[in-house]
C-alpha cells in the first residue's frame, strides 16, 4: 500500500493516514512525469505519454508497451521511441522487462527488441493510481498487477 518511497513510509509510520500517503504518492508521480519533460525538451511529450501509459499497460491483457498507443499514429515502430524508453529506464523512473524467446543463457541474446514491459518504480505509486484509498481492492488485487510489480521490484533489487 505505501510502497518503498521514504516520504510515504514516514507518513504511514507517523500518521497512519491513507489520505496523506496517497497525496504524497500523487505528488511524486506528478513530479516524475513533469521532471522528465524538464530534462529532455525534445522528447518531453512522448516521455510523459509513455510514463502515463504504464499503469494502463499493466492492467491490459497483453501487459506490454503497445507502440501505436503512444501517439496513435500508424506505422510507428518501437525504434521510433527508443530514446524515450531509454530516458525513463535509465533515470530510474520506470523498470524494464524484455521478453525472451528461449530460455538459453545469456537471456539478453534471445530478448525481443520490440517486446517491452514497463513498470512504475514503486508499488505504492501503482496502488495509488489503481485503487486510491480502497484498501479492500488493494488486498484483493484481482488482476495481480500490484503483486507483479512487487515481484519485479524485488528481482531488480537483488
Language-model-detected regions and their locations in the chain:
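Accessory nucleic acid-recognition modules appended to NTPase machines
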Residues: 2-158
Amino acid at each position: 500500500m505505501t510502497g518503498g518511497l521514504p516520504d510515504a513510509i514516514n507518513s504511514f509510520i507517523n500518521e497512519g493516514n491513507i489520505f496523506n500517503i496517497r497525496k504524497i504518492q500523487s505528488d511524486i508521480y506528478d513530479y516524475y512525469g513533469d521532471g522528465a519533460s524538464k530534462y529532455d525538451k525534445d522528447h518531453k511529450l512522448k516521455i510523459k505519454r509513455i510514463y502515463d501509459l504504464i499503469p494502463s499497460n499493466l492492467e491490459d491483457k497483453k501487459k506490454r508497451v503497445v507502440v501505436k498507443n503512444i501517439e496513435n499514429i500508424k506505422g510507428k515502430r518501437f525504434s521510433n521511441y527508443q530514446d524515450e524508453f531509454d530516458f525513463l529506464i535509465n533515470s530510474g523512473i520506470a523498470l524494464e522487462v524484455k521478453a525472451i524467446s528461449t530460455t538459453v543463457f545469456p537471456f539478453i541474446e534471445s530478448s525481443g527488441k520490440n517486446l517491452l514491459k514497463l513498470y512504475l518504480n514503486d508499488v505504492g505509486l501503482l496502488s495509488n493510481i489503481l485503487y486510491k484509498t480502497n484498501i479492500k481492492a488493494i488486498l484483493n488485487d484481482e488482476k495481480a498487477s500490484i503483486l507483479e510489480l512487487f515481484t519485479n521490484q524485488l528481482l531488480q533489487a537483488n
